[in-house]
Design a protein with these regions (language model features):
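Sec-dependent N-terminal signal peptides
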Residues: 3-12
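Noncatalytic, solvent-exposed loop/strand surfaces
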Residues: 14-404
Length: 404
């Protein structure tokens, strides 16, 4: 099988490059991250500013940080100088939202992470407002609201999927549990180019990979995992995949021609898309119930193991052999509700909702942390932004650059 991961944004334009959800290839890998020669006893806070509430993760493009958050009741996009923490510009709009009582503790968002491409920053608000801004000055280029298109403009717990840019198209899954559409828009104009209406949106974000020379946009939907051709929206394949409360929420991980899938109480499985007699099918390679990932997505470490944070045992770091599904090692239990995982400079960094960052060797053969740091004084749900100069951490309301 011919397979590759497709780069979905512009190539590296500077040393630091983290333009979207989970980095340049949406896989948690930070090629520009350097890290210290030796991890110190404590990290230094170089700057810290108030940016607002929400789980949206910071991104980096055009030499600046972009943070999407809720500030004074308005969804606010801020551009921030990475050296000083100075806010360069902000753009905001009123964003009233009533959170489902089952997720009250998560606040009113936003949860979706922006994407930077071609001088534009795209945001997707918790109630389903999709916007394109100039990265230079924040000027609004275009905006889409879907109240006239769908009965609900967001899933039960609010929009959490992070849009993706592919070959001049911004692709987002709009709508809610009563119907939605995976839709492609022209990045410059916002004109709709295609839509797929086979299922409502999940809380998960897509990736793009190429199988048998055919690009696949792969994502979870409300009740399935599926792939469409990103140029046309043509459905290539779809598998039933349902979790409690219709809460599909992880990003599929591409590993050597297979997809690592998981969800709340769903275990972990590997499936392989195959083209047979002109039709696409997905063959299950293995499945394990010994771990399960929810509200976090694993990474593929340098030693070939998949490192993730299982919600079993009340939160536990695990390493899985992607060829067999065997758990090679696991960390201590009771580590938190969720974790954000990135890797680079020979280490895997695991950020838990308990505000801890565990530093592991990327080639570790057992759970043996190099360091464990407290990185915030409030819960951390957003993914960190790894830069050459340090790590940017978003907690409940603040954004901070931690260095060494």
């Amino acid at each position: 099988m011919r397979y590759l991961i497709l780069f979905v944004v512009l190539p590296l334009f500077a040393t630091d490059n983290w333009p979207q959800w989970r980095g340049p290839n949406r896989d948690g890998a930070a090629p520009a991250f350097r890290g210290p020669a030796a991890w110190p006893e404590k990290l230094q806070t170089k700057w810290k500013i108030t940016v607002g509430e929400g789980h949206s993760s910071p991104i980096f493009g055009e030499g600046r940080i972009f943070q999407f958050a809720r500030l004074d009741g308005r969804e606010t996009l801020s551009a921030i100088d990475p050296a000083s923490g100075k806010v360069l510009w902000t753009q905001s709009y009123d964003a009233p939202f009533t959170m489902n009582v089952a997720a009250w503790g998560h606040g009113k968002g936003p949860k979706s992470t922006p994407v930077y491409a071609g001088g534009r920053v795209f945001t997707f608000g918790i109630s389903g407002i999709l916007s394109a801004h100039s990265a230079a000055d924040g000027k609004l280029i275009w905006r889409k609201e879907f109240a006239k298109t769908f009965k609900n403009t967001s899933p039960d717990f609010g929009v959490a999927m992070s849009p993706i840019v592919w070959e001049g198209l911004l692709i987002a899954h709009a709508g809610g549990d009563k119907g939605g559409a995976l839709t492609a828009f022209d990045v410059a104009t916002g004109d709709e180019k295609w839509r797929w209406t086979g299922d409502g949106p999940a809380y998960a974000s897509p990736v793009v990979g190429v199988f048998e020379d055919v690009p696949h946009l792969i994502t979870f939907s409300q009740k399935s995992v599926m792939a469409v051709h990103p140029k046309t929206g043509q459905l290539l394949w779809q598998m039933n995949y349902q979790t409690p409360w219709e809460n599909n929420n992880i990003t599929p991980l591409l590993v050597n021609g297979t997809l690592i899938l998981s969800g709340l109480d769903a275990g972990v499985k590997a499936v392989k898309p195959l083209l047979r007699n002109g039709a696409w099918v997905c063959e299950t390679m293995w499945e394990t119930k010994n771990a399960s990932f929810s509200m976090n997505t694993p990474v593929l470490a340098r030693n070939g193991l998949v490192i993730g944070f299982s919600h079993k045992n009340k939160g536990q770091i695990v390493a899985i052999d992607p060829k067999t599904g065997a758990i090679e090692w696991s960390g201590k239990p009771r580590q938190g509700d969720n974790a954000a995982i990135v890797m680079g400079a020979g280490v895997v960094l695991v950020f838990t909702t308990e505000s801890e960052m565990t530093v592991l060797r990327e080639d570790a053969k057992k759970y043996e942390p190099l360091r464990v740091y407290t990185v915030a004084d409030s819960p951390v749900w957003a993914h960190p932004l790894p830069l050459e100069s340090g790590i940017v951490v978003k907690d409940a309301k603040s954004l901070a650059l931690l260095g060494w």
